[in-house]
């Protein structure tokens, strides 16, 4: 069973459609055929009885009663509607006249039939029927074919009984008219054969039409399956929303799922990129410290605190970015804590001095101790670390830091004496992967990360010209009131 199911189940939609419609066509064809056969049979019986009764009336008209005997004179030019055998009885059931003397037929007429008008049938065999058809060569040929197929086949003859009351010229008579051609040799017996042929032809014609209908009807599903394969092969990003009404909801939900998955993938990829970038500074400090140890410019006792601090910084950054990845896009600030700005910047300056020790960068800071940052400490460190690292990288020697605070905003200014940022590129440097100077190493990530974080605080970063001759970065943090509720 499992092997069968594996090879044949589940059936495709096209096969299901074809089987279902073919079954419906078959059932309807059988039902219509049976109804037609029943209707034909009833109609055939009524028509046969009417014809036989007409011939009975004809024989009654042609009959003459003389000397207590009955005689029937048939005109030579009389055209009988169908070959029949007529028998005339008196009111006691005595046979008075018959067209031909066929003993088995006379014995087959039941006495009770003669008591009322009615329609009856006589069951006989092929040989007996042959005696009735002795003068009908066409019917004899058909009967011969039946005998060749089945020598024991039963034949059915229709019998009409009509009673005529006594008149002044004629006593009461009962006329029995027997149809000499059996029902099996009439066209009615071919109805079943025709029905089988019509049913077979119907299926042979309908199935190809159903296949075409199924192919046309299921084209949207085939198109959807093809688009899904293209998605798997990375040849498209979304499903085509222009589809049939029945599939619109499915396609819309799938596209929404694809969009959500892509956004989640991009979020984690961006977070991983940001984490990698944020680890550059502590790793550079560790590298510089190890180099100093190797060159014996620093003792182990002095290097150990520096290295432990940077390792702790790396651990904090990893935890920070994992948390940030889960909160990205939620619009919720991680904290409303108050942090003095000067100590945070002192730690960053100390780390950057180690990174750019060979370059001899001179970083100065003029910030009042009262100035504080409201929010997540790691957010502030990440933003200012990227901005200061960018300034140290492009300066010639000097970097200056200043700040001012209003009721709801914190402004921090970072200026350097480097080449500055051209006006045409000042908006581009905050986009991921965009850099004003492509000759120096970098990925164009730091300022983009800084801008994203400041935007979470309803802030911004503004690039302009510095009095030192280089670039001036104004970092603005909003939502700086300690009691302000998060939006």
From Swiss-Prot:
Binding-site residues, Mg(2+): 386, 443
Major subcellular location class: membrane
Subcellular location: Cell inner membrane
Family matches, as SUPFAM superfamilies: ATPase domain of HSP90 chaperone/DNA topoisomerase II/histidine kinase, Homodimeric domain of signal transducing histidine kinase
Binding site for ATP: 386-394, 416-421, 435-447
EC number annotated for this UniProt entry: 2.7.13.3, 3.1.3.-
Reactions catalysed: ATP + protein L-histidine = ADP + protein N-phospho-L-histidine
Superkingdom of source: Bacteria
Bilayer-spanning residue ranges: 17-37, 194-214
Xref: SMART domains: HATPase_c
Database matches in InterPro entries: HAMP_dom, HATPase_C_sf, His_kinase_dom, HisK_dim/P_sf, PhoQ_Sensor, PhoQ_Sensor_sf, Sig_transdc_His_kin-like_C, TCS_sensor_his_kinase
Role this protein plays: Member of the two-component regulatory system PhoP/PhoQ which regulates the expression of genes involved in virulence and resistance to host defense antimicrobial peptides. In low periplasmic Mg(2+), PhoQ functions as a membrane-associated protein kinase that undergoes autophosphorylation and subsequently transfers the phosphate to PhoP, which results in the expression of PhoP-activated genes (PAG) and repression of PhoP-repressed genes (PRG).
Subunit structure: Homodimer.
Alphabetized NCBIfam families for the sequence: PRK10815.1
Designated name of the protein: Virulence sensor histidine kinase PhoQ
């Amino acid at each position: 069973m499992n092997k069968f199911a594996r090879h044949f189940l589940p059936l495709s939609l096209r096969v299901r459609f074809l089987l279902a419609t073919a079954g419906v066509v078959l059932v309807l064809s059988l039902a219509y055929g049976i109804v037609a056969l029943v209707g034909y049979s009833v109609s055939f019986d009524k028509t046969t009885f009417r014809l036989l009764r007409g011939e009975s009336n004809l024989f009654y008209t042609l009959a003459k009663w003389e000397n207590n005997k009955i005689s029937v004179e048939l005109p030579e030019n009389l055209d009988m509607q169908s070959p029949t055998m007529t028998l005339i009885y008196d009111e006691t059931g005595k046979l008075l006249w018959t067209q031909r003397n066929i003993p088995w037929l006379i014995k087959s007429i039941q006495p009770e039939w003669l008591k009322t008008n009615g329609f009856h049938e006589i069951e006989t065999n092929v040989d007996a029927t042959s005696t009735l058809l002795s003068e009908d060569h066409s019917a004899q040929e058909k009967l011969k074919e039946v005998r060749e197929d089945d020598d024991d086949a039963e034949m059915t003859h229709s019998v009409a009984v009509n009673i005529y009351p006594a008149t002044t010229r004629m006593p009461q008579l009962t006329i029995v008219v027997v149809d000499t051609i059996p029902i099996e040799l009439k066209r009615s017996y071919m109805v079943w054969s025709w029905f089988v042929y019509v049913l077979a032809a119907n299926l042979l014609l309908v199935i190809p039409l159903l296949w075409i209908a199924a192919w046309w009807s299921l084209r949207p599903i085939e198109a959807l399956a093809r688009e899904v394969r293209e998605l798997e092969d990375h040849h498209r990003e979304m499903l085509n929303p222009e589809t049939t009404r029945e599939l619109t909801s499915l396609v819309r939900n799938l596209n929404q799922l694809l969009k959500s998955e892509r956004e989640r993938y991009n979020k984690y990829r961006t977070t991983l990129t940001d984490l990698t970038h944020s680890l550059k500074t502590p790793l550079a400090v560790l590298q510089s410290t190890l180099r100093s140890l190797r060159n014996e410019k620093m003792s182990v006792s002095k290097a150990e605190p520096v290295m432990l601090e940077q390792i702790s910084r790396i651990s904090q950054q990893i935890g920070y970015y994992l948390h940030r990845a889960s909160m990205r896009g939620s619009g919720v600030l991680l904290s409303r804590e108050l942090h003095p700005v000067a100590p945070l910047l002192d730690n960053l300056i100390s780390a950057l001095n180690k990174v750019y020790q060979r370059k001899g960068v001179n970083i100065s800071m003029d910030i009042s101790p009262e100035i504080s940052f409201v929010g997540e400490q790691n957010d502030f460190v990440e933003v200012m670390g990227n901005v200061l690292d960018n300034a140290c990288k492009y300066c010639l020697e000097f970097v200056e830091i200043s700040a001012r605070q209003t009721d709801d905003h914190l402004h921090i200014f970072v200026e350097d004496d480097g080449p500055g940022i051209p006006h045409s590129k000042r908006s581009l440097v905050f986009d991921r992967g965009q850099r004003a100077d492509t000759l120096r190493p970098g990925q164009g990530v730091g300022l983009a990360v800084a801008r994203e974080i400041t935007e979470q605080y309803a802030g911004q970063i503004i690039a302009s010209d510095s009095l030192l001759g280089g670039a001036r970065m104004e970092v603005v943090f909003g939502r700086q009131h300690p009691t302000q509720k998060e939006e």
